[in-house]
Design a protein with these regions (language model features):
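Active-site Tyr-X1-5-Lys
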Residues: 1-30
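Short beta-strand segments
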Residues: 26-28, 33, 97-101
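Glycine-rich "substrate-gating" loop/helix at the edge of Rossmann-like oxidoreductase active sites
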Residues: 35-46, 65-75
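Short secondary-structure boundary/capping segments
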Residues: 40-49, 112-118
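Alpha-helical substrate-binding/gating segment
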Residues: 51-65, 71-107, 111-116
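A hydrophobic C-terminal alpha-helical subdomain
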Residues: 63-67, 130-180
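Amphipathic terminal alpha-helices
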Residues: 160, 164-207
Length: 207
């Protein structure tokens, strides 16, 4: 088995571009979500960390109030593919892009849609969330479903922070290329979560 450390791979590519004249680009992507065209997920797009977090909240049925205003992107996988094709044709002097939907949504929006669909997630204090998560981690039948939330297990939740990214340059490049990201509206969120539910995503322990 070969393991590739992402930063090391990027470093190697950038060195090849700089020293060997390789025509290459690094295009990082956001949270790959259901297609904009029909709301369907590709099989391998439901295994990323963000999706596992959603499963954890749905299983725990609790969400920390201080994270309700955290912003995330929903990047439809078919739209990401379009941007990659466009960005790959840009000047060779530009080598790093971040293809992520520029229209952010707050976690609170997602929690409310989940609840409208019957998931019954309670918004609670950080302390209550942490207590409930630790209790569920002791349940062998459910611990795997909430394992992605293990970073909250620190005794001090205030030590955790979200790393913000800036893809302003990429977004402006896409505008120059005649592309605009679709707005992530209520209907898209609802369709995406319903599609996940139909796939049995929230109950499966193998994803």
């Amino acid at each position: 088995m070969e393991l590739f450390w992402e930063p090391a791979c990027e470093k190697a590519l950038l060195e090849a571009v700089d020293k060997e004249g390789l025509d290459g680009k690094i295009i990082r992507v956001g949270n790959l979500m259901s297609r904009q065209s029909d709301g369907e997920f590709q099989a391998n797009s439901i295994t990323n960390g963000f999706m596992r977090d959603l499963k954890g909240y749905a299983t725990l049925k609790k969400f920390p109030v201080n994270s309700m205003d955290v912003e995330v992107d929903f990047s439809p996988i078919d739209e990401v593919a379009k941007t990659i094709l466009l960005l790959s044709k840009t000047s060779s002097k530009f080598t790093v892009y971040h293809s992520a939907n520029s229209h952010m949504v707050q976690m609170g929006d997602i929690i409310y849609v989940l609840n409208e669909l019957g998931f019954g997630i309670e918004v609670v204090s950080d302390e209550e969330f942490l207590k409930s998560m630790k209790e569920m981690m002791m349940d062998d039948s459910k611990s795997m479903l909430v394992s992605s939330l293990i970073s909250y297990s620190s005794s001090d939740m205030h030590t955790h922070s979200f790393i913000l990214s800036d893809n302003e340059f990429t977004n402006k490049s896409l505008y120059h290329l005649g592309y605009k990201w679709p707005i992530t509206d209520y209907q898209y969120l609802k369709n995406a979560i319903e599609s996940l539910d139909t796939l049995g995503f929230f109950e499966r322990t193998d994803l």
